[in-house]
Structure formats: C-alpha cells, structure tokens
From Swiss-Prot:
NCBIfam families, A to Z: ATPase-IIA1_Ca (TIGR01116), ATPase_P-type (TIGR01494)
Membrane topology classification: Multi-pass membrane protein
Role, per record: This magnesium-dependent enzyme catalyzes the hydrolysis of ATP coupled with the transport of calcium. Transports calcium ions from the cytosol into the sarcoplasmic/endoplasmic reticulum lumen. Contributes to calcium sequestration involved in muscular excitation/contraction.
Transmembrane spans: 49-69, 90-110, 254-273, 296-313, 758-777, 788-808, 829-851, 898-917, 931-949, 965-985
Stated name of the protein: Sarcoplasmic/endoplasmic reticulum calcium ATPase 3
SMART domains: Cation_ATPase_N (SM00831)
Self-association and partners: Interacts with sarcolipin (SLN). Interacts with phospholamban (PLN). Interacts with myoregulin (MRLN). Interacts with DWORF. Interacts with VMP1. Interacts with TUNAR; the interaction occurs at low levels in low glucose conditions and is increased by high glucose levels.
Alphabetical UniProt keywords: Acetylation, ATP-binding, Calcium, Calcium transport, Endoplasmic reticulum, Ion transport, Magnesium, Membrane, Metal-binding, Nucleotide-binding, Phosphoprotein, Sarcoplasmic reticulum, Translocase, Transmembrane, Transmembrane helix, Transport
Subcellular location: Endoplasmic reticulum membrane; Sarcoplasmic reticulum membrane
Upper lineage: Eukaryota, Metazoa, Chordata, Craniata, Vertebrata
EC number(s) recorded for this UniProt protein: 7.2.2.10
Binding site for ATP: 353, 442, 489, 515, 560, 625-627, 678, 684, 706
Residue sites binding Mg(2+) per the record: 351, 353, 703
Length: 999
C-alpha cells in the first residue's frame, strides 16, 4: 500500500477492513497470506553449478585455447612412433589450464552473490500482533505477519513489516532508521497523515519501516507492506536486478582477445595457404592430405605461440598480491579485478554518516550568559574538542583551556546535561571503543559532562569502564531524578523533576531541568542565569541569544542546538497530573535560561586532507546523504568539498530537486554536483548510472542497507568495516578501519598495480610476438620447426610466468598521486609502445630462428648443410642428389630446437630485467630495486636446465643438453636485446615524451 502515509489512520484501517482493538480474523489472515505470501525475503535462486562452469568458457581467449586443445587432440590421434606420447602432452596441458581457470572463476562467483542473503539478518524472527482469535497481544513468527495485521512495537524491538502508525502509547516514539535512510539521529514519529505524495522515506514520519529499530516508546501500527513490498524488500529487488559491471581491465582483455583471434586467424590461414605447394613433398610420402595435416599442425603451433597462456594466471596472482598489500592498509578487497579498477577511479561518491563523519554525535560548542543588564547581553562562548564518544577533550574559551568548575553557569549546564538524560556511555571491551547506550543526542551530552568535569573529580587510576560515567555519577549523587516529562512534538522539549539527595546550601529544594528546541524553550523563559544569580530575560537578551543560536544553526557549522533551562520553583509533584501529557507545557513555564549547546555528527579529522589529495589526483568527491541539505552543505564546507564562500547552486541537490530535473538535466547535474542530500536508495543507483554514462569510474562508499544496491552497481563498492553485512557483501572492498583515508591509500595502490600490470602484460606479449615471428619465419622460409607447441606452452606458462609475476612487485612512481586518473579506455599498448614491443618481438623471433639455423649451418657438431639445402629439407630423400651424403634424420634432431628454446628463454630473462621501468635506463633503475624479479629470473633459468637435464623431461619437451660452446652462442644472440631496449627507452625519454607534451 504505497499511499498509506497520505491517509489518516482510520482510512488505512478501513482499507484493510480491520479495527485496532480486534485485529484481523483468521479468514482474513488466510486470504492475505494467499494474496501476499509470507513476510520474508525469498531465497535468491543462484545459478546452477553447470551454468557457472559454462560461463567460464565465454571468454574469447579461453575459447581460442579450447579450440587449440581440441585440434591438438585430433592431430595427436594420427601421430606415429615416438611422437605419440608427446603429442598428447600439449592438449592435456591446455585443458588443465582451462579447468584450473574455471574452478577459480566458479569459486569467485559462488561467493559474490551472498549480499542478498545477508539482508535476511534484518528480518526480525518474531512479532507482536493483535488478532481476533485471541485476546490481547500475541507473539507470532514475523514471517506470518500479513498486510492488515495490527502490530505492537516497543523500545528495543526490530520493526517486523512496514507499518502505518495508528496509536502511540507513550509520550513519544523515536526510531533509529539509519540503516535504511542514513540519518545520523533517531527520528520522532507521529500518527498524523502526511499529504505529500512525493514524500521520501525520511519525511514519512507516520511510517515504521521493516528492519529498523525502536529507540524509545511504544506504539501500534497496521502492517501495510510485507516481504518484497517493504522498503527493505525493494532494496533486495534492486540488488537482484543489478548486473555486475565488467572492469576496465576485463574489457581491455576482451578487446585484446578479439584482436588476437583475428590476427591468429589471418596468420594461420596465411601460413597454410602459402605452403599449399609443399603439401605433396617427399617428406609427406607424396600424400597431399598428410602435407595438409602437417602444415595445419604448424598453424596450430602458431595459435599456441600467439596466445599468452600464462596471462590469466599472472594477472590473478598480481591482483591477489595487491589485495594483501591493501589489506595491510586496512582495505580488504573481495573482488580481485576491482584492485585494478581502483587505479582509474575518477569519482568517489561517499555516504556522509559514518564514512566522512564519525556517526558519533559530539558537542563542539556551548555558551552561558556572562552579562544581561538593561540593553546589553554578553555571552561566555566555549569550544570543546573530541569527535567521538571517547570522554576525552578540552574545553576552551577562545584559545585558552578553562576549568569548567570556575563558571557557575557551566556547573548548572553540566547538571542539566547529566540529569535531563536517559542515555549513557559504555566502554566496549571487545572492540576497545566507547559506545552509546540510548539516544545519540543524549549520549553527546553525557560525553560533554565527562569532558567538563565541573567538580574536578580525580579521574586518575580509573579503568575505561569506570571512566565512561565517572563525572555524571558525581552529579547524580547530588540530585535524585523523581520522574520524567517525556518529549512531545507540540512543546519540543522534555524535562526531569529532581530533588536533592541531602541538605546542601548549593542545592535548595526541588528543581525541574528542561532541554529542547531553543525557540520553544526560550519562549517559556522569563529569566536568565548570569553566574549564580538570576536576571530578567529582556527582549534584547532574548534576541541576542536567538541570533547566536541561528548563527550556529546555519552558515559553515549547521549545528544541532539544544537550549537548557531550569524551573527553580516547580509545582509540588502531588499537584501535577502526570498522566495527562497535554499539561506538561504548563509545568515547563516560568523557566530560567541557563545555556545552549551546539552539536554535530563531526567530520573525521583525517578526511579533509584526503579530499585535498583526491583533488590533486584528479578525483572528484561527491557526498551523498539522507540528512537535510543545510547540514550536508555545512559538512561539505568543513571537509573542503566546497569552499567556505563557494556558491553551491547547481552543485548541491536534494533528492526531490533531483527528481524535478529532466533526464538530461539529471545527467548534467551528476557531472557537476558534489553534494546530494535527502536521497533514497533509488537516487544513489541513478547517480551511479548517470556518472557511468560519462565513462566515469565510480567508487561508492557506504555502510547501511540503503547503500547496498548502489554499492553493487558502482565499479567499486566500498563498505565500512562497522557497516551492515548487506553493504559488505554487496561491495568489492571493505574498509576495516572505516577510514576514508584508506580509500585514498587503496587508490594509490590500485594505480601502482596497474602500472606494474602494464609492464608484465607487455613483457608477455613481446614474448608471444617473438614466438609468432619465429614460427612464421620457419614456415615462410621452409625451415624445420624451431619450436614445437609443447615448448611454447612451457615458455608461456612457466618460464615467462615467474618473472611476469615478479614484475608486480616493481616500486611505484613517486608522483603517482599527482597525475589525473587514467582513461579506462586507454589501450594497454598503442602507437610508439606498440612499435617498441613489436621491435623487441621481431628481434626475439629472428634470434630464435637464427639459433636453430646456426646449428644446421655452422655448428661443428651439426650437419653443416647449406642454407639452400635447409630451406628444401622436406625434399630430402636417399635418391635426391641435392642431399647426397646427408642423413635426412638430421633435420629431426633435437639440438636446433634446444638452441632456439634456450635463446628464447635467455632473451626473455633479459627482457624481464629491462621491464623494471617502462622508460628509465637500467643504469637509473637497476634490477635489484625489485629483488623478487632477480629471484624469478634465477628460478626460470633453473627450470630451463631442469627440462634439459632431468629425464623424462628431455623426451617430453624434445630437447637435449647443450655444450659450453653452444651456450656461448646462445648468450651472444640473447644479450643484444638489452642494448636494443636501452636505445628504444632513450628515444622514449628524449623524443616521444616531448611529442606528448607538445600535444
């Protein structure tokens, strides 16, 4: 029932054909249950295991590998002799890679969808209802509540369904709905209709929402929505509908896969077509079909060479290592790809309450009257330090610390704060923090009393548990609270009736202490306390006090102000009608104004510096909150999101103002705005959508249930460690210390990780280019195979994989947070860089082919054939005069492939050392800056020697040990790559960067 807040309580009851006294009949309950279903959030039907497995093979790179494996399997069946065993190694290795990749992917997916289930923790297990089958209130399972049920709630209860209030059974009803709306203080509710069809949840003061908590009071309501129809249920539906966005890296790798598949197709077809004339060569027994299959195998080898099989594993490893480094900085990453996405974050949309602020109300200013003579009024103003519930802070007047006990007015102010209060401070020993017990506003007053210490209580030697209420307990020993006149909306105040516990000249007779909204309390004041004496409250003094309060409540502070007053001679309690709350205002008259306190949910002290740092890094910070616009803008000014005098027109919007804009205006508003106030969950998701339409990479922070859909929709969802389980499981990242500063550290780490990823991706790709050039050259020139597929797989996965992973440990650039965010569409390799890595790759390919050719032509242990004979080796037969005296089996020797493989591995190790920096010379940034890289190079070379020397590996990889002279040739062909890359780096530094600057 969407419009329940618009109707009177009687109209809502009529709609459901129910009375508040009798409740629903059993027939009505049965009908409603059939119509609306159970009052619970349905269990999410996740994807089946089979669906998840199939999904892992939708990636283009994976499909290319799968095709290569299937073709290799088919070809392996036709192998004969010694090659039969080794032929199956290649497809088996590829399949093992794909299976491992799928297992990791399925495991991640299984964990990712837990957010929806976490919402269930906000569903209360039991509820209290009135039904016609039994007298009075009965407890039933919350899932059995149906629309139309009369539900009773009291302090401490979790609201079991969305309720329209019909009767408040206490003087006031306050509800903590911060998990749903993000409001930092509990909200006073009433039963009146709200004639505003566009009211947001924060303005629906006659509604109680499922999953929120009753802070004080007792009430009856009629259930108007259950299950998925509740506001909590709508959030669940939004979360279920959100499709996870692919990260910039995933999109780039998809694009890379598409380009690679096209390139592979062209090259493979070209190699096969070029060699059609050789299909019937004697080496194939004159069979055209056998020749076609032979060259098809070479085309498959090309495909294997072109695919960087090790890339998925190396990227996963690098991101996993990055998450460990981030965890040490209090940023726990749940989704691996989001580590890289952090590096291109351009907008951080931050929830205010508990993220930019502490979510711990704190009194930061107070005043008492110093002078109130005819025509003049002077105030004693004080500031109080401390931004949490920790009872430590300093009271200052101007710049000077003061002893509060020296001011009679402050002693009385502290007395009112301590006694006119139903809340307390508590030290949570498990968490090691001070927490509120009761109302946030009243807890702030309790904390203020502890900081003021007006009776100079000796606090040394107290445990933290004892310290939580030491100063308050001293005041409570002097006066005893007899009863409380609860807060009500009409008088906007509450009061306590207190009597002295013992005869004391300072305390004479019973008193009433009052606190409430300044305008309402001051209106009922006839005098003002000046020190220890009482003076009449003149019009001048009244205006002066109200002007100061208005000043605090607006401008850069927007403090929540409370006036504190005393009734020195209250009526006798026997003469007071305490069961009639309409008379309370009569008892709270003829008051003496004592002072005023100003409080706020204070900004975290470290946030302002972080926002400045974000600004320097080209990242826009946008505050999104459920609080009112004035408070939100004031906090923005304190944090530096807005300047002190900056005009916020077009930069700050309420949810309603945002709704009033056309879709295009909403898009433009999201492009410029830095503050959104009074928003609902749907607004947050729309803001993220609009930002994404401008290709902004959005990080959304939050801690409440209301943040979860937007956290899931944003590229980076960041939840607070103290936040709700729903927010945490919808997010990609959780801040264990709830500190906005940790986001900035995580962004810096993300940028460093991306830079390192660029290095190892380019490193791996230059290796693949070299392998493709090698196979393409041997095919075009008609030379024997220099590298076979199983060797290529070994290099791509193992030998190159270790240094590539170690490149993830490269140190970050010093100016990494002084640059704007990189464009998420920026290509991994483009322009000059593409030429650089193509040049390196071509050299790798030429050197590899040259090494194999050298053994045939020049090695004293080789056949020393001519280059012409080598190019026509397929025509070799006993009766061919061109090959007289040459054993044709020499063209199947393992030595040339071993030479080629050794050169490829050695060059790749040199390349890895070159990759410590993209443009800096090895003389400026030597390899030992990354000791992990040196270890990886040593390990890779050790593994290479392993396959050369340890049986049965030489048989599997078709290699053989080399002599010292042969190793000398390998080094001569490999080391020049360092000089080539140094020359290309020199050109980059001195010419290419200058061109960029000119652009």
């Amino acid at each position: 029932m969407e419009e329940a807040h618009l109707l009177s309580a009687a109209d809502v009851l009529r709609r459901f054909s129910v009375t508040a006294e009798g409740g629903l009949s059993l027939e009505q309950v049965t009908d409603a249950r059939e119509r609306y279903g159970p009052n619970e959030l349905p269990t999410e039907e996740g994807k089946s295991l089979w669906e998840l497995v199939v999904e892992q093979f939708e990636d283009l790179l994976v499909r290319i590998l799968l095709l290569a494996a299937l073709v290799s399997f088919v070809l392996a069946w036709f192998e004969e002799g010694e090659e039969t065993t080794t032929a199956f190694v290649e497809p088996l290795v590829i399949m093992l890679i794909l299976v491992a990749n799928a297992i990791v992917g399925v495991w991640q997916e299984r964990n990712a969808e837990s957010a929806i289930e976490a919402l269930k923790e906000y569903e209360p297990e039991m509820g209290k209802v009135i039904r016609s089958d039994r007298k009075g209130v009965q407890r039933i399972r919350a899932r059995d509540i149906v629309p139309g049920d009369i539900v009773e709630v009291a302090v401490g209860d979790k609201v079991p369904a969305d309720l329209r209030l019909i009767e408040i059974k206490s003087t006031t009803l306050r509800v903590d709905q911060s998990i749903l709306t993000g409001e930092s203080v509990s909200v006073t509710k009433h039963t009146d209709a709200i004639p505003d069809p566009r009211a947001v949840n924060q303005d629906k003061k006659n509604m109680l929402f499922s999953g929120t908590n009753i802070a004080s009071g007792k009430a009856l309501g009629v259930a108007v929505a259950t299950g998925l129809q509740t506001e909590l249920g709508k959030i669940r539906s939004q979360m279920a509908a959100v499709e996870p966005e692919r990260t910039p890296l995933q999109r780039k790798l998809d694009e890379f896969g598409r380009q690679l598949s096209h390139a592979i197709s062209v090259i493979c077809v070209a190699v096969w077509v070029i060699n059609i004339g050789h299909f019937a060569d004697p080496a194939h027994g004159g069979s055209w079909l056998r020749g076609a299959v032979y060259y098809f195998k070479i085309a498959v080898a090309l495909a294997v060479a072109a695919i960087p099989e090790g890339l998925p594993a190396v990227i996963t490893t690098c991101l996993a290592l990055g998450t460990r480094r981030m965890a040490r900085k209090n940023a726990i990453v749940r989704s691996l790809p989001s580590v890289e996405t952090l590096g291109c974050t351009s907008v951080i949309c931050s929830d205010k309450t508990g993220t930019l602020t502490t979510n711990q109300m704190s009194v930061c200013r107070m005043f008492v009257v110093a002078e109130a003579e005819a025509g003049t009024c002077r105030l004693h103003e004080f500031t109080i330090s401390g931004t949490t519930y920790t009872p430590e802070g300093e009271v200052r007047q101007g710049e000077q610390p003061v002893r509060c006990g020296q001011f009679d007015g402050l002693v009385e102010l502290a007395t009112i704060c301590a006694l006119c209060n139903d809340s307390a401070l508590d030290y949570n020993e498990a968490k090691g923090v001070y927490e509120k017990v009761g109302e946030a506003t009243e807890t702030a007053l309790t904390c203020l009393v502890e900081k003021m210490n007006v009776f100079d209580t000796d606090l040394k030697g107290l445990s933290r548990v004892e310290r939580a209420g030491a100063c308050n307990s001293v005041i409570k020993q002097l006066m005893r609270k007899e009863f409380t006149l609860e807060f009500s909306r009409d008088r906007k105040s509450m009061s306590v009736y207190c009597t002295p516990t013992r005869a004391d000249p300072k305390v004479q007779g019973s008193k009433m202490f009052v606190k409430g909204a300044p305008e309402s309390v001051i209106e009922r004041c006839s005098s003002v306390r000046v020190g220890s004496r009482t003076a009449p409250l003149s019009t001048t003094s009244r205006e002066h006090i109200l002007a100061k309060i208005r000043d605090w409540g607006s401008g850069s502070d927007t403090l929540r102000c409370l006036a504190l007053a005393t009734r020195d001679t209250p009526p006798r309690k026997e003469d007071m009608h305490l069961d009639d709350c309409s008379r309370f205002v009569q008892y709270e008259t003829d008051l003496t104004f004592v002072g005023c306190v100003g409080m706020l949910d204070p900004p975290r002290p470290e946030v302002a510096a972080c926002i400045t740092r974000c600004s320097r890094a080209g990242i826009r910070v946008v505050m999104i909150t459920g609080d009112n616009k004035g408070t939100a803008v004031a906090i923005c000014r304190r944090l530096g999101i807005f300047g002190d005098t900056e005009d916020v027109l077009g930069k700050a919007y309420t949810g309603r103002e945002f709704d009033d804009l056309s879709p295009e205006q909403q898009r433009q508003a999201c492009r410029t705005a830095r503050c959104f106030a009074r928003v609902e969950p749907a607004h947050k998701s729309r803001i993220v959508e609009n930002l994404q339409s401008f290709n902004e990479i959005t990080a959304m922070t939050g801690d409440g249930v209301n943040d979860a859909p937007a956290l899931k929709k944003a590229e980076i969802g960041i939840a607070m460690g103290s936040g709700t389980a729903v927010a945490k499981s919808a997010a990609e990242m959780v801040l264990s210390d709830d500190n906005f500063a940790s986001i900035v550290a995580a962004v810096e780490e993300g940028r460093a990780i991306y830079n390192n990823m660029k290095q190892f991706i380019r490193y791996l790709i230059s290796s693949n280019v070299g392998e493709v050039v090698c196979i393409f050259l041997t095919a075009i020139l008609g030379l024997p195979e220099a590298l076979i597929p199983v060797q290529l797989l070994w290099v791509n996965l193992v030998t190159d994989g270790l240094p590539a992973t170690a490149l993830g440990f490269n140190p970050p650039d010093l100016d990494i947070m002084e640059k704007p965010p990189r464009n998420p569409r920026e290509a991994l390799i483009s322009g000059w860089l593409f030429f650089r890595y193509l040049a390196i790759g071509v050299y790798v390919g030429l050197a590899t082919v040259a090494a194999a050719t050298w053994w045939f032509l020049y090695d004293t242990e080789g056949p020393q054939v001519t280059f012409y004979q080598l190019r026509n080796f397929l025509k070799c037969s006993e009766d061919n005069p061109l090959f007289a005296g040459i054993d044709c089996k020499v063209f199947e020797s393992r030595f040339p492939t071993t030479m080629a493989l050794s050169v490829l591995v050695t060059i790749e190790m040199c390349n890895a050392l070159n990759s410590v920096s993209e443009n800096q010379s090895l003389l400026r940034m030597p390899p030992w800056l990354n000791p992990w890289l040196l270890g990886a190079v040593v390990m890779s070379m050790a593994l290479h020697f392993l396959i050369l020397l340890v049986p049965p590996l030489p048989l599997i990889f078709q290699v053989t040990p080399l002599s010292g002279r042969q190793w000398g040739v390998v080094l001569q062909m490999s080391l020049p790559v360092i000089l080539l890359d140094e020359a290309l780096k020199y050109l980059s530094r001195n010419h290419m960067d200058e061109k960029k600057d000119l652009k």
